[in-house]
């Protein structure tokens, strides 16, 4: 079956070209220094490139030091979340890990025997605090609060399938819009903006609702591109492209159409909210600053789709999506961590069985 991610439509003004600044090796070195990655480990180096590359799609026009901050956020997201999602820890140990990370953001200190992700979190927190200074404590607090909320969302989201059944789509979306990690990206962008805008703007219900809509769309895009990986990892129960098929007894193509229609609904509602929100601003400087934030919301969607089409984390020669199969075929055969190689090995195993 051939589906196309290009069925997802959004305004052409949301299109982007990835940031061309060189920064990935610098984040890798930082990951080595902070104990996230292992020295002389090719798998770690490739993993770093795969996950950190996302920031050049989310922040395609920022300067180097800000792109580094975006790269650190991606490094922290993936290394902290993947360890918990792997199911390596008991509930008690997981609760302790979450509490430790919360304290890093709240207090700006490291616990005893800090982990690599905890050190990355403190490094990013410190940079944000310096950039915000004394004049923008509200911005800084919004950033660290959004990070804590994301950390606290991981366990509840994973527990939503405790009864062995997929959640209702509405409940799934409500939990996932925090768990997807869009809010820390937005608040980090506010830190980068070095804004002179009044703080009350970020509490406007239209702005908050716009953020929620974007988070839901990013969630659904991520669910589409990760479909095959999650089914292969026995986690399809938490992927709506999969669980809508089983709940509604429909084919993959029909499930995909339903999700694309949902994406278009949320984008349409977002556009209407954005138009109303922009009416609040009258001066050219205000409009320029708020456009920087709006562009980032747009890039979270367009960048997520564009990155997902080419990252070895998701592409596969057996993907239901044309673009992901095509890009898998163009990968070097030596990229042994790619999903292409993984899916080929899986196919061979199934054939032997």
Curated annotation (Swiss-Prot):
Superkingdom assignment: Eukaryota
Motif (NDxxSxxxD/E motif): 222-230
GO molecular function terms listed in the Swiss-Prot or TrEMBL record: metal ion binding; terpene synthase activity
Top EC category: lyase
Keyword Metal-binding attached: yes
Record keywords, A-Z: Lyase, Metal-binding
Motif DDxx(x)D/E motif, residue numbers: 81-86
InterPro entries membership: Isoprenoid_synthase_dom_sf, Terpene_cyclase-like_2
Annotated GO biological process: terpene biosynthetic process
Entry annotated with the keyword Metal-binding: yes
Reaction catalysis annotation: (2E,6E)-farnesyl diphosphate = (2S,3R,6S,9S)-(-)-protoillud-7-ene + diphosphate
Enzyme nomenclature, EC number: 4.2.3.160
PANTHER family: TERPENE SYNTHASE, TERPENE SYNTHASE 2-RELATED
Record text about domains: Contains several highly conserved motifs that are important for catalytic activity including the aspartate-rich 'DDxx(x)D/E' motif and the 'NDxxSxxxD/E' motif, both of which are involved in complexing metal ions to coordinate the binding of the isoprenyl diphosphate substrate in the active site.
Protein family: Belongs to the terpene synthase family.
Function: Terpene synthase that converts its substrate farnesyl diphosphate (FPP) into the sesquiterpene protoillud-7-ene.
Protein's recorded name: Terpene synthase 1
Name of the coding gene: TPS1
């Amino acid at each position: 079956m051939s589906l196309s991610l290009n069925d997802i439509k959004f305004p052409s003004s949301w299109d982007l070209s990835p940031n061309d600044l060189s920064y990935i090796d610098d984040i890798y070195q930082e990951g080595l220094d902070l104990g996230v990655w292992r020295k002389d480990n090719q798998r770690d180096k490739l993993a770093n490139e795969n996950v950190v590359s996302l920031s050049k799609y989310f922040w395609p026009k920022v300067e180097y030091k800000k792109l580094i901050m975006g790269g650190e956020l991606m490094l922290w997201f993936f290394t902290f979340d993947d360890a918990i999602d792997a199911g390596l820890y008991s509930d008690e140990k997981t609760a302790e890990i979450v509490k430790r990370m919360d304290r890093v953001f709240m207090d700006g200190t490291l616990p005893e025997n800090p982990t690599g992700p905890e050190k990355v979190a403190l490094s990013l927190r410190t940079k944000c605090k310096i950039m915000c200074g004394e004049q923008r404590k509200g911005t800084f607090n919004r950033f660290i609060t959004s990070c804590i909320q994301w950390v606290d969302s991981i366990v509840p989201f994973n527990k939503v399938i405790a009864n062995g059944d997929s959640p209702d789509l509405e409940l799934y979306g409500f939990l996932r819009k925090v768990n997807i990690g869009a809010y820390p990206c937005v608040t980090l962008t506010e830190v980068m903006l070095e804004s002179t805008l009044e703080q009350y703007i970020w509490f406007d219900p239209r702005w908050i609702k716009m953020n929620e809509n974007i988070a839901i769309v990013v969630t659904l895009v991520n669910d589409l591109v990760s479909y095959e990986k999650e089914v292969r990892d026995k986690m399809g129960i938490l992927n709506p492209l999969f669980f809508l098929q089983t709940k509604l007894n429909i084919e993959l193509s029909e499930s995909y159409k339903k999700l694309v229609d949902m994406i278009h609904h949320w984008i349409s509602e977002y556009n209407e909210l954005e138009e109303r929100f922009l009416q609040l601003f009258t001066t050219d400087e205000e409009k320029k600053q708020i456009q920087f934030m709006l562009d980032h919301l747009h890039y979270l969607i367009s960048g997520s789709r564009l990155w997902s089409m080419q990252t070895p984390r998701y592409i596969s020669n057996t993907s239901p999506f044309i673009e992901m199969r095509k890009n898998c075929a163009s990968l070097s055969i030596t990229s042994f961590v790619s999903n292409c190689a993984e899916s080929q090995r899986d196919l061979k195993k199934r054939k032997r069985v």
